[in-house]
Amino acid sequence: MNPLKDRISEAVLKSIENIGTVGIDLPIRIEYSRDEKFGDYACTIAMDREWRSAAAAVHPEFTNPRKFAEAIVKSLQSAKGYAELFDSAEIAGPGFINLRLTPSLLEACTREAVREGTGYGRTARSQPKSIIFEFVSANPTGPLNIVSARSAALGDSCCNLLEAAGDRVHREYYVNDYGNQVDLLGRSCLLRMLESEGAKLKFAIKDHKGDYSYPAGPGLPFPPEGYHGEYLIEIVQLILGENPGLKPPADVIRRAKELSKRSDNAGDPIEQLELASLADDLGKRATEYFLSTHKLDLSRFRVRFDGFYSERSLHESHEVLAAKDRLGERVFTDGEGKILFRSTDYGDDKDRVIVRDDGRPTYLLADIAYHYTKIKRKFDRIYNIWGPDHHGYIARLAGAMQAMGYPSEDFRVLIAQQVNLLEDGKPVVMSKRTGKFITMKTLIEEIPIDVTRYFFVMRSFEAHLDFDFNLARDTSEKNPYYYVAYAHARIRSIFRKAAERGLIPAEAVGRPELLLELKSSPIEMTEERRRLYWLVARLPEEVRDAADSIEPHRIVNYLYSLATALSRFYAPTENRIIDQEPSTAVSLLILLGGVAACLKNGLGLLGMEAPERMTREEV
């Protein structure tokens, strides 16, 4: 079944063509009514200046939005099939068209939801797009943190929605396994290894100006920007356990211990001990280890990837330096010998260095090379999720994409804003380098995955998220996930109770589509029932709209509205199913079966489960 908005748009377009206004290629906006007492949908076409101007070329009086709306409604009401789709079409204000759907159409949509089951909400596109969606892409220099967890939940949900809307999606993780951060990781691991053998370390302190200085006294200087977390001690022991030959010789360890006793040592201990190659090796091994833990944690978090693309592979295949030639005339060499990309031609605030004066490529050039592989793989659209600290990076990469011939409208970067952790109303401070942070692994061991994913997608990308641990641990309906989950579990409880009372066959509990074969009676379309019918009918377009706008939080809002409508449905005694005659009970259970399908499918698209049973169930 096509989304209702599509059917309404087609009907409105035909009505416009029937009044002699044809050949206008403009979109028709169909919105939900702000106040449902006026209708289900609102069409603002008569208020659109472009539409009025185009229509007035044939009918000059259509410059008046009210007259344009009156003509559309009159044509709509006289069209074949109007009565099957619309219960009413009325004009409000200067030219808004309010549309109300027929009860029979809403009932048909609900029966379709029950019939399709887990497939309801999915649609097909006439021209599906192939999309590469890159997300998480966290540096493999430590465990995944809670910020990466949000990116994972958002990205996975977006991909699910795009696939449900009919597109083909390739999910990719870009592995930053090359460069300065990997070097720092290797050096940090090596110093922790020497510490485990008895050498002392000392750590730099940052002052109020942001400058680092080491405290007086003995110790091997630890890199100020290195990874301070004590989790590295365990990682080093794991690496040594699998590769005992990596342990430095006894004389080197002795020298390291002696060096660490000196108070006047300000040099690089790794260079002094001639252990640079070992540090490089440890950096590679540590990144491999952390990447393996990333994959495991993401799998546990129900996040799927189709590919992991290594930055190191780009450097080893010489694709990075070759990428500067992809930018054509948009590169130049300055007086210091650096090669720059003219990113100011594309809205950046300054031109960017892509090759340093010593011939080494910058991270930007590596990123350009990686994105060129996406172009070569012929994806129709390229989507990325980045963290809030990368906002200023968008213009330069978007400019590079244009310079390489990729359409700007098909490249999009979504910024996942910061996660603020709250415990007992107080903020929890995080830092991967200092080791003071909550890992994804710890999070999903303490908070159920369903709750965690719900919290991470319930706000838009651009909204900061307050993750309240106290609320996340709460299993009552104050927790928004459980509010929605209870709604599904309650329906399933009602189905089981109806079978126990003999109102429906036991087989229909697990296969609600069997209800469609049973005798049912017409039921009064009360306000509470109608709202449920309408919300069930909306799921396909809610999914499609959320996919098109890349806004998974819209599905969260929809599910919460559906659960709220269900709660109101239970209030009148006339909706108490176990007190009904069998044929009336079947009709109400078909409605609830449609609601359950929407709750389950909506949660599923966001990577969450809809429980069959919960401790608190009501009939």
Predicted region positions:
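Non-catalytic interaction-recognition regions
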Residues: N2-E107, R115-T118, R122-V619
